[in-house]
A protein has these predicted regions:
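Short beta-strand elements
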Residues: 482-518, 609-652
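Residue-level detector of functionally pivotal "anchor" positions at catalytic/ligand-binding pockets or at interdomain
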Residues: 367-390, 508, 650-678
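Active-site-adjacent structural segments surrounding the nucleophilic cysteine of cysteine proteases
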Residues: 86-253
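Contiguous beta-strand segments within globular domains
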Residues: 394-424, 454-460, 521-549, 583-585
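Noncatalytic regulatory segments and standalone regulatory/sensor domains
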Residues: 18, 22, 26, 30, ...
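Bacterial Sec-dependent N-terminal signal peptides
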Residues: 1-19, 243, 265
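Active-site-adjacent substructure of cysteine-protease-like catalytic cores
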Residues: 43, 48-71, 263, 267-335, ...
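C-terminal outer-membrane/trafficking sorting elements
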Residues: 10-11, 652-704
Length: 704
């Protein structure tokens, strides 16, 4: 939930809040919320050390105040003045610090992580945009206090004589369906085995008749067997539809992917086909809140999810909002799906903005948040809208001349909607002074299905020669075939370029790729043409994000590059100083006729707009900070074979003109053929030089 916070511009010295400061804030807050203080028993409850993320700070990231006597009302105060004062509150529900639901603990972890990322710098002088509103939406699920245990899980499978819990995704889904009391009956079926416990799950949804009238808003006290059966039937159907990986409470519960909700709602329960599942790191703060508020304004509860640092993903429902007294973004009402515990209003705005006022996402919380939009019964109307999203959008130049050409690119263009795309992509330039919008570079977009992406997407655009000088925000637009509208393609940030008649083109600063790794090794075996190199802890060493590819480079003994070879690896976009935790393997075969001698093999990285590859550096704690050195393997080529670290790799010879080549398996059966007139085919075919039995395929030539 580290989104851009709606703080007013201010000039002050930053300081942490003490418990005394927090108590003073609570005293003022309850004066305007009398239901919280009616028992006069609201007090501070410290958390045990294992309940929050280690912040390495003397002060608390937040302070929890609750009314234990009346069991009504709580307030959570932030631990730093740069965060909103009130992080969460409720006038109706309790907050037991000794029994915090996992979903709520996730939220508290996010608050603590935001607190830990606050710079000790004193100045909080910055200005941020806001999305203020005077409108409110009362909780749409008001009264619903469902959970994951009994009686909700009575039809869930058992494991080791213990009944599995429903799972937070299923409970949240059931709550939304209960809001609509729809459908009357399901459709389709499912048959699968769970990943963790290998439990066989089967369900024929066409036989499900949902008895909405028999379901209670809560099952805390008395209920009949009929009422219990009605809600447990719904819960199991929801879980099976998202292919729930069922587990017991002692195992940590049951889990499912949030993205599965969209297909389950539509395919098994006849919900609207215009639904979508959006990721937080694909939207700006303003867009994210605008979409979320619009859904709630339309009376549609929102299935929301986040990723915990300690125990995986969590799903719950946002079902209302009201104006915040201490933030320019609303307080959202959260139903945690935990028998009503801790339900209340919570801040989901950026709790720890960067010192420059900009929005950063290296923390990972933004990227882990998701929401399902458009959830409602099928209305039979195709609105032709597609939620197309990108990771960060970039331009190759920040200052350009009229009539010049630049590139607009992103690491990934994703279709977040259930319906596939069918149309074109355009670039718009919006003047920051008079909001004049110019549409250019309308190009075809290949069809993308639900959650499908096009990697390393780029467009070359020519700046109109007659466009007015000034600053322009660059955005993408999607034009659906058969419509007249250009729909916004969402991005977490939109680049700004300066256009002038006489100015020189200014490529983006430090445009070359600068990557490093902590260690590397040769992972291949001798006798195989395929060279495989593993990189450990690959890191982007500069502030600019890395979007591009990585390949092997053959150089002479002085380090001059001779050729690139092998697979082109395209890692996910790497943010400022981001580290890839998993080892990265790069492999391929060297082709050609090379003279005997000494050579080097480097690993090179190339950003999407970069013409040549930059050697990846080797960094280690023994090397002074800011100093890096290239790494490479020394290699010897002798009679068509390359020797690296005592291992031998046959080199695939160059294609000779007017010669046919065939790749064969060990039985000498031809499995691929190529000619000397199509050298590129050899490279495309490199990955099939292994036979089905895994052995090296033979290569022979035959004169025409």
């Amino acid at each position: 939930m580290l989104l851009l916070c709606g703080l007013l511009p201010c000039f002050c010295w930053a300081q942490h809040r003490s418990i005394t400061d927090a108590e003073s804030i609570v005293e003022k807050f309850v004066l305007t919320h009398p239901k919280i203080s009616k028992g006069n028993n609201i007090k501070y409850h410290p958390l045990s050390k294992d309940k929050s993320i280690e912040t390495n700070q003397e002060h608390q990231p937040y302070y929890i105040f609750s009314d234990d006597a009346e069991r009504t009302g709580f307030v959570i105060i932030s631990g730093d003045e740069r965060m909103p004062e009130i992080l969460a509150y409720s006038e109706d529900n309790s907050f037991n610090v000794d029994n915090i639901p996992p979903n709520v603990q996730y939220w508290l972890d996010c608050y603590a992580e935001a607190f830990s990322r606050l710079s000790p710098a004193a100045s909080t002088n910055r200005q941020s945009v806001s999305l203020s509103t005077t409108h409110e939406v009362q909780p749409l699920l008001e009264g619903n206090s469902w959970g994951q245990g009994d009686p909700y899980n009575r039809l869930c499978p058992s494991y080791n004589n213990e009944r599995c819990v429903t799972g937070c995704v299923a409970t949240a889904m059931a709550q939304v369906m209960a809001h609509y009391r729809y459908p009357a009956i399901g459709k389709g079926s499912v048959d699968y085995r769970t990943l963790t416990n290998n439990i066989h799950v089967t369900r024929d949804f066409s036989k499900d008749e949902f008895l909405w009238g028999d379901m209670l808003e809560n099952y805390k006290t008395h209920f009949t067997e009929i009422q219990a059966k009605a809600v447990s039937e719904l819960m199991f159907s929801c879980g099976a539809s998202v292919k729930m990986d069922y587990g017991t409470s002692s195992q940590g519960g049951s889990g499912a992917y949030q993205t599965s909700l969209v297909t389950a709602y539509i395919n098994n329960f006849s919900y609207d086909r215009d639904m979508a599942c959006l990721f937080r790191n694909h939207c700006s703060t303003e867009d994210w809140h605008a979409i979320l508020m619009h859904e709630l304004d339309e009376g549609r509860p929102v299935n929301y999810a986040g990723q915990s640092l300690r125990d995986g993903g969590h799903s719950f429902v946002l079902d209302g909002y009201k104006t915040s007294t201490n933030s320019n973004y609303p307080d959202y009402h959260v139903n945690w799906g935990w028998n009503g515990t801790c339900n209340g209003y919570y801040q989901i705005a950026n709790l720890a903005p960067a010192e420059d006022g900009q929005q950063h996402t290296a923390d990972g919380f933004n990227s882990s948040q998701q929401m399902v939009v458009g959830t409602m019964p099928e209305d039979g109307i195709d609105n032709h809208f597609r939620f197309l999203c990108t990771s960060n959008l970039h331009t190759s130049s920040s200052k350009v001349k009229n009539g010049s050409t630049i590139q607009v690119y992103t690491a990934s263009l994703v279709n977040s909607s259930y319906k596939e795309t069918n149309g074109t992509i355009a670039v718009t330039l919006t003047n920051s002074e008079d909001t004049t919008e110019t549409i250019i570079a309308d190009t075809y977009l290949k069809s993308l299905g639900y959650q499908q992406e096009q990697r390393n997407y780029s467009l070359n655009i020519t700046i109109p020669s007659n466009i007015k000088e000034g600053q322009y925000q660059v955005e993408l637009r999607y034009h659906h075939t058969g419509t007249n509208d250009y729909q916004k393609v969402f991005s977490q940030q939109y680049p700004v370029i300066t256009i002038s008649d006489s100015g020189e083109d200014n490529p983006t600063d430090d445009y070359y790729a600068y990557l490093g790794c902590s260690d590397f090794e040769l992972a291949s075996t001798t006798g195989d043409s395929i060279i495989c190199i593993k990189l450990y802890e690959l890191q982007n060493l500069i502030e600019d994000p890395f979007i591009g590819d990585i390949r092997m480079i053959l150089a002479n003994n002085q380090g001059k590059a001779l050729t690139v070879f092998g697979d082109s690896i395209q890692p996910d976009e790497m943010g400022m100083h981001e580290i890839v935790e998993e080892p990265l393997s790069i492999q391929g075969c060297l082709t050609g006729d090379w003279e005997n001698g000494k050579y080097r093999i480097y690993i090179g990285a190339r950003r999407i707009n970069q013409q040549s590859y930059t050697n990846i550096s080797f960094y280690d704690i023994t090397i002074p900070q800011g100093e890096y050195k290239d790494f490479y393997f020394e290699a010897d080529i002798v009679d068509g074979k390359m020797m690296i670290d005592g291992k031998t790799f046959p080199i695939i010879p160059s294609i000779i003109q007017d010669t046919s080549y065939h790749l064969t398996n060990t039985a000498n059966n031809v499995i691929y053929s190529l000619t000397g007139t199509r050298q590129s085919s050899l490279r495309r075919g490199i990955n099939i030089i292994r036979g089905k039995d895994g052995r090296m395929c033979k290569i022979f030539k035959k004169n025409k």
